[in-house]
């Protein structure tokens, strides 16, 4: 028997407890601007830490290979129903353990090794699972990539011409470092014109889409994949939305195709996050996410930094650092020293190596969760510029760090 009072983390494993405590303090003390990170609610974390972690449940609600699944069936069905409502989808699979596995599930359902797929170039803002050479998608399939035009928007004309020429079996839309609105309807029509499947990976934009502040790809795509964290503010995991005609193939591809028993405690966390995302408060939050990103981008441009594409229409932006004569790797380090967390990121046609880069990627979801509004977003942008204007002055870094501390104390993550 486990006595709850005796089996606490601090008593059983002080080393892990200490690391958790330090990470909690880091999250409170640092301004988080990594676009793919956010803070889950205590309710989501409670679901993930529940007894549901004990239950094996291979299969799907009502069709399990294990007994004792009557309550986890309720949990999974709620997650399915809520995510369908959230995005207006005909069918959904909530079992993928990650966004990458959601993408793999679609590939396993409709592709064979050697088939041609078409996705956005990683170097111009795409994602490694959309055909990057070292990824499974690049090793198993013949990959053709589309990119950006001179205005650093997706080159839809070139995309269409390439699709007509190469006739891919699957066209993928979605990005990990692209700030503008994606014309899912147009790409969907291109896919339909050549008889290709159309998959959208909306992992970065899912929260915005749920709130109606970014175009919804669901009406235009055969498959829509997403993570459940990032802007959606749920647990780390994945989901596949699909047309009803593809439900059987996708379900078989996930189980038994590429996964075994689902993580029921994570699915519970997903269900809670979907309920939160259906609320009016979540819509207001996402509206503020977009406002904060725009305010930050405008301020950075006023301070002499170039924003790739000239603006942001979402939660994310790429900052070209070459005018400041600093690399993305260096900027990530000095901003981190000032307690502003960012990630280095390649810009289009980047002359630097991928581990060095000429840019950083910034996102507004996490700071907006803290309660930051436009005024704070402007302050944060000025603090970033202050660091980049004088990155090797320790007194300057210390002064910025002190100003960051004032903001983080005023806006705690978990009050």
From Swiss-Prot:
Residues reported to bind (6S)-5,6,7,8-tetrahydrofolate: 122, 126-128
Highest taxon of source: Bacteria
Keyword annotations of the record: Amino-acid biosynthesis, Cytoplasm, One-carbon metabolism, Pyridoxal phosphate, Transferase
EC number: 2.1.2.1
Pathway recorded for this protein: One-carbon metabolism; tetrahydrofolate interconversion; Amino-acid biosynthesis; glycine biosynthesis; glycine from L-serine: step 1/1
Swiss-Prot/TrEMBL catalytic activity: (6R)-5,10-methylene-5,6,7,8-tetrahydrofolate + glycine + H2O = (6S)-5,6,7,8-tetrahydrofolate + L-serine
Pfam families: SHMT
Main location (coarse class): cytoplasm
One Gene Ontology molecular-function label: glycine hydroxymethyltransferase activity
Site (Plays an important role in substrate specificity): 229
Subcellular location: Cytoplasm
Stretch forming the signal peptide: none
An annotated GO BP: glycine biosynthetic process from serine
Cofactor: pyridoxal 5'-phosphate
NCBIfam families: PRK00011.1
Quaternary assembly: Homodimer.
Record's protein name: Serine hydroxymethyltransferase
Gene source species: Ralstonia pickettii (strain 12J)
């Amino acid at each position: 028997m486990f006595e709850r009072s005796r089996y606490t983390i601090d008593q059983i494993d002080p080393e892990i407890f200490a690391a958790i405590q330090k990470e909690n303090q880091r999250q409170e003390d640092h301004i988080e601007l990594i676009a793919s990170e956010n803070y889950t609610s205590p309710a989501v974390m409670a679901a993930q830490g529940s007894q549901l972690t004990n239950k094996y449940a291979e299969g799907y609600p009502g069709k399990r290979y294990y007994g004792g699944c009557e309550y986890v069936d309720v949990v999974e069905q709620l997650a399915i129903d809520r995510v369908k409502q959230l995005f207006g989808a005909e069918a959904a699979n909530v079992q993928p353990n990650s966004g990458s596995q959601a993408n793999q599930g679609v590939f396993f359902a409709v592709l064979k090794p050697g088939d041609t797929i078409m996705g956005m170039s990683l170097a111009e803002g795409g994602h490694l699972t959309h055909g990057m050479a070292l990824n499974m998608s690049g090793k198993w399939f013949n990959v053709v990539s589309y990119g950006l035009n001179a205005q650093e928007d997706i080159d839809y004309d070139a995309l269409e011409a390439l699709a007509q020429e190469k006739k891919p079996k699957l066209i993928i839309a979605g990005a990990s470092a692209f700030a503008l609105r994606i014309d899912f309807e147009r790409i969907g029509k291109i896919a339909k014109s050549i008889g290709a499947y159309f998959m959208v990976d909306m992992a970065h934009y899912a929260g915005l889409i749920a709130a109606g502040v970014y175009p919804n790809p669901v009406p235009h795509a055969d498959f829509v994949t997403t993570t459940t964290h990032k802007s959606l503010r749920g647990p780390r995991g994945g989901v596949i939305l699909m047309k009803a005609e593809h439900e059987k193939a996708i379900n078989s591809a996930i189980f038994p195709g590429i996964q075994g028993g689902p993580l029921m405690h994570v699915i519970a966390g997903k269900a809670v996050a979907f309920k939160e995302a259906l609320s009016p408060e979540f819509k207001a939050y996402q509206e503020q996410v977009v406002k904060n990103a725009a305010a930050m981008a405008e301020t950075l441009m006023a301070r002499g930094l170039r924003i790739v594409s000239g603006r942001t229409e979402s939660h994310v932006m790429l900052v070209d650092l070459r005018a400041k004569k600093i690399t993305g790797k260096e900027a990530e380090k000095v901003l981190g020293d000032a307690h502003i967390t960012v990630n280095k990121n390649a810009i289009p046609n980047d002359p630097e190596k991928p581990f060095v880069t000429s840019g950083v990627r910034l996102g507004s979801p996490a700071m907006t969760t803290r309660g930051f509004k436009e005024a704070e977003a402007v302050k944060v942008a000025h603090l970033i510029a202050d660091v980049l204007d004088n990155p090797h002055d320790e007194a300057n870094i210390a002064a910025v760090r002190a100003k960051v501390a004032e903001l983080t104390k005023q806006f705690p993550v978990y009050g």
